[in-house]
Amino acid sequence: MRGGAAGKRRTTVGFGGAPPPPPPSIEQQRHLFNSRDSDASFASSRPSSIGLGGRGASDDRSSMIRFINAFLSTHNFPISIRGNPVPSVKDISETLKFLLSALDYPCDSIKWDEDLVFFLKSQKCPFKITKSSLKAPNTPHNWPTVLAVVHWLAELARFHQHLVSNSTSVPEDNSMNFFAIQSFGHFIRGEDDKVNDLDSQFLGKLEAEKTSVAETISGCEKISGELEAKLESLRKGPSKKESLEKVKADLENDVNKFRTIVVEYTDRNPAMEKVVEEKAKELKAKEEERERISVENKELKKSVELQNFSAADVNRMRRELQAVERDVADAEVARDGWDQKAWELNSQIRNQFHQIQTLAIDCNQALRRLKLDIQFAVNERGETPAAVMGVDYKSVVKPALCSLCDGIKGSSAEKVEELVTLQHHKSEMASKIESKRSLLGSIQLQINDLEEKMKLVKKETQELSTKCDLEAKTLVESVKAEALNLEVVEKEAAEFVKASELRLQEAVKESEEEVQACAAQLFALIDSISKQKEYMDSKISEIKTGVADTASAVSEIYKANFKKNLGI
């Protein structure tokens, strides 16, 4: 039977965390399971819903099956649902029983189908299912609805388990309000012992929070000490110049390594050039072979074209192929039309049969109220009206109704006689009522007196409530004073943290100033070294010129002496 939406699905709270992809809506599922294929399409190679979104329906069903199998696998359930072929009746029934157990719903092993139908109705499931459809759930008519019900139960079970796993107590975010409400409630009830216990508990919590604040302050002091130690280590450690010199030495080593690698690759270049030349020669040989093969292919094409095929034969073959294609297309269109008509007729018959079933149920209920031993039993395979309804109206139902009508007429006459007697009783009751009204007047006076007394009691209770309100206000003020003390402690802690941060900033500034002073000294030293270098260069140039002059003078003196010696 087709699943129809009997009511709207109840909105549920979303899962915590990253929830899973959202399931298809009720309208999508209703469209999916109302647009199923007809009976004739199961025997054919193509479904009757071609062009009506059949592929989307199959995708939705496959996504439902994947969701159900994922849920069953997470619970180590040995059975998995398949789309093609359809699972057996036993697998479907075991899956439904398991889902009911996952929802903590007691299920009878024998009458589990009745329990399932009652559970779906109580939870307002959007898909209708009956016991008769559960007897054969894997038939083409029942399988889409059963699959939708299984998917709906799996979603409900997952949501139920999420609620069970994430069941949290009532939040107590504002502890002060919670304490005030509880203490006032105990005070109103006169439970002084519980009030004292609650006060002691709350004071214990406040002391625990105070100790936690003290611990955070000590932790901040430890952090400030660690930061000061780091500052001292930075002062005592190597300067930036030394670290930069180390980096420079490492970079020079890397440059030398890269130079050696470049030299090695330049040595390998001639060998690689030889390999490239060999590959170029092989490529030329391959191109020559390709040209030869292309020439052979052209010759083969020419020989094929020279074969005898007349144009008339080719045109005739084309026309025959076109005619065959048109016949095939017409046959497919006709088959689709007949499938559509069969599907529509089946849907109309099914709707009429459902209406007959509902009418038969209403008639059976009316016959039970009339206390007649006649019941309509609808039969799908009946050929005559009597066979379909299970009872012949003219021979069985009509005589019974006529006899019932005669009995009603006889009983109506008796009721008229009873009505006359009841009117006499009515007059007697009226006299009794008047006597009782006088009694009610006296009772009303007593009630008024009691109401005045109640007003006095209410005034007293209001005065007591005002007193209780004043006492509650005093308690609230005391709690607020303690809260202010806590805020003062927190402010002192925050000021201490700020002071430590300011000290740290001052220390950092001092270290930066010292570094800048060292850098200025370094730059001054570099300037003096450059000036000294220039001075030494000028001195060396002067010495070189003097040495050159002395060398020229010595050579001239030597030449003069040598000439003198030669003249002698």
Curated annotation (Swiss-Prot):
- Keyword RNA-binding assigned to the entry: answer is no
- Main subcellular location of this protein, as a coarse class: nucleus
Sections of the chain in a coiled coil: 241-334, 433-469
Q: Which domain of life does the protein's organism represent?
A: Eukaryota
Q: Does the keyword Coiled coil apply?
A: yes
Q: Where does the record place Low complexity bias? A: 40-49
Q: Where in the cell is it found?
A: Chromosome, Centromere
Q: Which GO terms describe its cellular component?
A: Ndc80 complex
Recorded hits in Pfam families, A to Z, give:
Ndc80_HEC (PF03801)
GO molecular function ontology, one term from the record: microtubule binding
Instruction: Fetch the InterPro entries from UniProt.
Output: Ndc80_CH, NDC80_plants, Ndc80_sf
| Record keywords | Cell cycle, Cell division, Centromere, Chromosome, Coiled coil, Mitosis
> Which stretches are tagged as biased composition: Basic and acidic residues?
28-39
Q: Which segments carry the region annotation Disordered?
A: 1-59
Q: Name one GO biological process term.
A: cell division
Family as reported in the entry's similarity comment: Belongs to the NDC80/HEC1 family.
How does this polypeptide assemble, per the annotation?
Component of the NDC80 complex, which consists of NDC80, NUF2, SPC24 and SPC25.
Question: What is the role of this chain?
Answer: Acts as a component of the essential kinetochore-associated NDC80 complex, which is required for chromosome segregation and spindle checkpoint activity to ensure proper cell division.
Q: What is this protein called?
A: Kinetochore protein NDC80 homolog
